[in-house]
Amino acid sequence: MALISLRQLLDHAGEFGYGVPAFNVNNLEQIHAIMEAAQETDSPVILQASAGARKYAGEAYLRHMVLAAAETHPDIPIVLHQDHGSSPAICQASIRSGFTSVMMDGSLREDMKTPSDYDYNVEVTRRVCEMAHAIGVSVEGELGCLGSLETGQAGEEDGVGAAGTLSHDMMLTDPAQARDFVARTGVDALAIAIGTSHGAYKFSRKPTGDILAMDRIREIHEQIPDTHLVMHGSSSVPQEWLEIIRQYGGDIKETYGVPVEEILRGIKMGVRKVNIDTDIRLAMTGAIRKSLSDDRSEFDPRKALLAAKKGARSVVKLRFEAFGCAGQASRIKPVPLERVAKLYS
């Protein structure tokens, strides 16, 4: 099956009331794990790559691994999404490389550290939409800065994260402003700020409404009911994998992620794309540590990497099933980007 646009997939998810986990990838084992879980559950896939992932794997290597996934799993619709684009030029380069969806993160300046002003965000995002939509590529924007309502810190992942201490207002998307932003930019999907952050250290305790503003999703959705909402920093940080990492020599302090049941609340309120990276990293790290410890004489890295792939696959399968993705892939008929482009004209 050819790669499809994010807009087509999220429109389908909106019509049938499910959410799609968007998994960050940077290596072969991660892509294998995601595609095998998708095949097993008949789930559509969003594979997304950050600037750090593209630097690590190499743009061409990453692109061809995704094309190989599409060839190997012809019945599974795949979106290739650029995560956290820092400028229109970066988004343009990704489109030329074959990405079918790009995120223009105008909530931060091009250094991906400095919070931007609203007009800057609108202008750079509008320019990317104009460029991408002309050829059927989807665009995700971001309004508000990801960050912890507990600490005021954004956290950092692959070089992305606001520096300094952020105010509560900066870390919560304003619903009325979201309506204006969508009207002025034309984004297909909007990443919103509700107190989530990148990385494993999201919350020091199980999150409640004072540090995870789930009700804000409903308020935003009421203002922009036709725009797909995106939750970033939404790994659940499985405690069982933290225990395995600690048991086999790792040192990860007490931490909590976004509970799956809270994500399901978000899906009911209009969230269609749920970004997940840390959960896969934790599962792979735990599996590798256990594999190497269980057989200290083993020197074939494939054994540990196979264990890592199995660990990641188990997490991915659970998310497909929980979010309602399972069984949806076979219901999607791919629309060529050329036809998608006509929808914007």
Swiss-Prot record:
Similarity comment: family membership: Belongs to the class II fructose-bisphosphate aldolase family.
Cofactors: Zn(2+)
Enzyme class: lyase
Substrates-to-products reaction catalysed: beta-D-fructose 1,6-bisphosphate = D-glyceraldehyde 3-phosphate + dihydroxyacetone phosphate
Gene Ontology molecular function: any one: fructose-bisphosphate aldolase activity
Active site per database record: 83 (proton donor)
Species this protein is from: Cupriavidus necator (strain ATCC 17699 / DSM 428 / KCTC 22496 / NCIMB 10442 / H16 / Stanier 337)
Pathway: Carbohydrate biosynthesis; Calvin cycle; Carbohydrate degradation; glycolysis; D-glyceraldehyde 3-phosphate and glycerone phosphate from D-glucose: step 4/4
Keyword Zinc: yes
Annotated transmembrane regions: none
The enzyme's E.C. designation: 4.1.2.13
Binding locations of Zn(2+) 2: 105, 142
Residues annotated to bind D-glyceraldehyde 3-phosphate: 50
GO biological process, one term: glycolytic process
Keyword terms, alphabetized: Calvin cycle, Glycolysis, Lyase, Metal-binding, Zinc
Binding site for dihydroxyacetone phosphate: 199, 233-235, 275-278
Stored InterPro entries: Aldolase_TIM (IPR013785), Class_II_FBP_aldolase (IPR050246), FBA_II (IPR000771), Fruct_bisP_Calv (IPR006412)
Quaternary structure, from the entry: Homodimer.
Name of the protein in its database record: Fructose-bisphosphate aldolase, chromosomal
Residues that coordinate or bind Zn(2+) 1: 84, 198, 232
Source superkingdom: Bacteria
Textual note on the cofactor: Binds 2 Zn(2+) ions per subunit. One is catalytic and the other provides a structural contribution.
Role, per record: Catalyzes the aldol condensation of dihydroxyacetone phosphate (DHAP or glycerone-phosphate) with glyceraldehyde 3-phosphate (G3P) to form fructose 1,6-bisphosphate (FBP) in gluconeogenesis and the reverse reaction in glycolysis.
